[in-house]
């Protein structure tokens, strides 16, 4: 189901200009996203939770003495952005905890992440632009982080005034069409989740581009709302509510795929009482496990009753329990003779014949009992299933634009989305140069994505200005903390960080030598003169960061709509720029493994787009491990302090 959020009011143009000129910063930066549209749980949604009494759920940070003091010290350390006196920055330890204790209840799940960056030189995309190779849709990922530089021309109107947002919807439409074009199913792969022996499905980007006619789209949208809201019909899993089966026995069936609501590591610990059991949460499309009777008249009544049950998203307030369901249906069915007859019929039917075949026949009858044409139901199901990727955040600052897309089934596991734009351009704070950073929590791992456009220039010493931009971005980037709104969080405080964009680092080599080595594809000799690689080796900037091996030609500077580097034709009146690897992708943190680092041959701009694919190990809370650890601790405590006997 979709949850519509209130529409943000349009910002007044003069206020935008004044805020830019006066360098006024809001407390919280807004961003755009798709409407919330959750998907039913599957075997990919780990971990499951069972009702367990006597559980006191705490984080390992709480187990250390002096936790508050250590966090206060940590806040003081990062209050200046982690910048040392010498001008560099020092990476701080975000957690002070025992990894041994942490391993007792945390699992690791591999998530495939694609990071893509492209300086489009202010060019608007054509309607038929193909970016499949750039986004590597043949090797689909779980998360796509797509960054642009110069998405609008860097003229005075966009820099000093309200930037043009016209190209953004067009780029988003192309990205959405590309990611949701294919509908292939890849093979099952092994995923280190809660159950290492379980096979988890790895979906590729879905098929058939969304080119349906407007009338079909409207019909499908209306059908989705009616089926989900009025009949509690789950289009994704073909499961239906059956209230009659629930009448004889209302005890909940154990579903191992029920997910544990994620809790960010910086949030307050949740205390679960020892007497009451853990309450389960249903996703917006999850079914209640009931069955409708064979009689359509009885089915309509039970469907109307089931509609009264309130649903909840897994990461929101736990407001639905089986006791509430049981009490509600008991009250409604106690005075209903139809309910008793339907339950008796269902009980008699279930006693003979093949139960599995009977369920399939009942399912077909249920579909027809709603009076809906099967072709419309199928069309509605296809439209819903085709949207496998949704946009969870996008943000523009002048020419810098970053957009994050994620599989719809993973959206429920994303929390604490924050954005932080930092301008380091004209006057030291204008947005023609700078960065847009995104912070989010996926399961229990904090991730940060930094899309930047650094100072240009190929003269000697220009790399020092770029280094200064990096230090300034790290110092000024702030994310409001979930634990304490007054305590900022910085880029190095995350578990995994990805920095990408037009970093503008050049080659310390003459133009003629560069072009000669490029023509001979001698990349290793060129890399020895690369400014960024030298800085990484010396530790002057991006200390501790990593970059994959570069095995592709320099990405800058090309002639527009051509495969020829600019400056090769000496008779043309153009700036002479030696080829360079200006567009880069770096990463910092544990559990990151790079699979691919490449560029794509799209000739629209004077830059070539760059892509990197990663396998990222994110932390997932495992309730089973926590239960075992608590049992061991309780047993040890009982052995040391035995209960007195009377």
Curated annotation (Swiss-Prot):
Coiled coil: none
EC number: 3.1.3.56
Catalytic activity: 1D-myo-inositol 1,4,5-trisphosphate + H2O = 1D-myo-inositol 1,4-bisphosphate + phosphate; 1D-myo-inositol 1,3,4,5-tetrakisphosphate + H2O = 1D-myo-inositol 1,3,4-trisphosphate + phosphate
Example of a GO MF term: phosphatidylinositol-3,4,5-trisphosphate 5-phosphatase activity
Chain spans, region Catalytic 2: 575-590
Effect of a null allele: No visible phenotype. Alterations in germination and in early seedling growth. Enhanced sensibility to abscisic acid (ABA) with elevated levels of Ins(1,4,5)P3.
UniProt region (Disordered), positions on chain: 59-99, 185-207, 329-369
Enzyme class: hydrolase
Compositionally biased residues, Polar residues: 188-207
SMART domains (alphabetical): IPPc
Gene3D superfamilies on file: Endonuclease/exonuclease/phosphatase
Biased composition (Basic and acidic residues): 59-74, 341-350
Keyword Hydrolase among record annotations: yes
Segments for region (Catalytic 1): 495-510
SUPFAM superfamilies: DNase I-like (SSF56219)
Gene Ontology biological process terms in this record: abscisic acid-activated signaling pathway; inositol trisphosphate metabolic process; phosphatidylinositol dephosphorylation; response to abscisic acid; seed germination; seedling development
Tissue expression notes: Expressed ubiquitously.
Pfam families listed in its UniProt record: Exo_endo_phos2
Keywords: Abscisic acid signaling pathway, Hydrolase
Role this protein plays: Has phosphatase activity toward Ins(1,4,5)P3 and Ins(1,3,4,5)P4. Seems to be involved in the abscisic acid (ABA) signaling pathway. Could also be able to hydrolyze PtdIns(4,5)P2 and PtdIns(3,4,5)P3.
PANTHER family: TYPE I INOSITOL POLYPHOSPHATE 5-PHOSPHATASE 2, TYPE IV INOSITOL POLYPHOSPHATE 5-PHOSPHATASE 9
Family: Belongs to the inositol polyphosphate 5-phosphatase family.
Protein's recorded name: Type I inositol polyphosphate 5-phosphatase 2
Lineage, highest ranks first: Eukaryota, Viridiplantae, Streptophyta, Embryophyta, Tracheophyta
């Amino acid at each position: 189901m979709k949850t519509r959020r209130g529409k943000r009011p349009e910002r007044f143009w003069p206020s935008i200009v004044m805020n830019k000129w006066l360098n006024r910063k809001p407390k919280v930066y807004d961003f755009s996203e798709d409407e919330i549209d959750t998907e039913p749980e599957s075997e990919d949604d780990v971990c499951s939770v069972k009702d367990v009494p006597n559980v006191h759920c705490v984080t390992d940070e709480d187990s250390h003495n002096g936790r508050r003091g250590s966090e206060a010290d940590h806040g003081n350390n990062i209050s200046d952005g982690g910048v040392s006196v010498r001008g560099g920055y020092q990476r701080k330890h975000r957690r002070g905890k025992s990894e041994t204790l942490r391993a007792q209840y945390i699992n690791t799940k591999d998530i495939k992440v694609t990071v893509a960056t492209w300086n489009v030189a202010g060019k608007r995309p054509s309607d038929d632009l193909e970016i499949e190779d750039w986004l590597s849709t043949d090797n689909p990922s779980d998360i796509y982080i797509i960054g642009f530089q110069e998405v609008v021309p860097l003229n005075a109107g966009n820099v000093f005034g309200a930037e043009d947002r016209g190209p953004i919807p067009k780029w988003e439409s192309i990205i959405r069409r590309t990611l949701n074009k294919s509908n292939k199913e890849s093979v099952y792969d092994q995923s280190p989740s809660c159950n290492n022996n379980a096979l988890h499905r790895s979906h590729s980007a879905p098929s058939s581009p969304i080119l349906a006619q407007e009338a079909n789209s409207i019909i499908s949208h209306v059908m989705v709302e009616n089926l989900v809201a009025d009949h509690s019909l789950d289009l994704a899993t073909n499961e239906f509510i059956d209230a009659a089966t629930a009448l004889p026995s209302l005890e909940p069936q154990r579903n191992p795929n029920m997910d544990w609501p994620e809790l960010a590591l910086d949030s307050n610990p949740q205390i679960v009482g020892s007497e009451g059991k853990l309450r389960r949460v249903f996703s917006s499309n999850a079914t209640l496990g009931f069955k409708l009777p064979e009689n359509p008249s009885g089915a309509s009544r039970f469907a109307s009753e089931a509609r009264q049950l309130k649903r909840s998203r897994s990461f929101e307030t736990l407001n639905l329990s089986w006791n509430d369901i049981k009490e509600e249906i008991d009250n409604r069915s106690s005075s209903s003779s139809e309910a008793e007859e339907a339950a008796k019929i269902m009980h008699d039917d279930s006693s003979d014949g093949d139960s599995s075949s009977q369920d399939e026949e009942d399912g077909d009858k249920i579909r027809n009992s709603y009076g809906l044409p099967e072709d419309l139901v199928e069309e509605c199901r296809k439209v819903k299933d085709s949207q496998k990727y949704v946009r969870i955040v996008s943000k523009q600052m002048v020419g810098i634009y970053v957009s994050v897309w994620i599989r719809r089934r993973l959206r429920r596991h994303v929390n604490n989305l924050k954005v932080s734009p930092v301008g380091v351009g004209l006057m030291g704070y204008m947005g023609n140069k700078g960065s847009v950073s995104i912070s989010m929590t996926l399961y229990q791992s904090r991730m940060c994505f930094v899309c930047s456009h650094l100072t240009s220039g190929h003269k000697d010493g220009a790399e020092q200005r770029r280094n200064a931009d990096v230090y300034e971005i790290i110092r000024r980037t702030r994310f409001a903390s979930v634990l304490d709104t007054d305590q900022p969080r910085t880029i190095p405080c995350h578990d995994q960080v990805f920095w990408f964009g037009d970093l503008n680092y050049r080659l310390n080599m003459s133009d003629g030598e560069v072009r000669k080595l490029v023509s001979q594809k001698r990349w290793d000799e060129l890399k020895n003169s690369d400014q960024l690689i030298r800085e990484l080796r010396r530790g002057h900037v991006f200390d501790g960061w990593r970059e994959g091996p570069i095995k592709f030609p320099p990405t800058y500077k090309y002639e527009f709509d051509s495969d020829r580097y600019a400056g090769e034709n000496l008779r043309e009146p153009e700036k002479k720029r030696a080829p360079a690897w200006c567009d880069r992708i770096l990463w910092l943190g544990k559990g990151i493994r790079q699979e691919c680092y490449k560029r794509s041959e799209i000739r629209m701009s004077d830059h070539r787009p760059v892509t990197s694919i990663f396998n990222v190990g994110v932390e997932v809370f495992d309730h089973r491990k926590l239960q075992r650890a608590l049992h061991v601790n309780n047993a040890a405590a009982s052995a040391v302090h035995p209960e007195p006997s009377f």
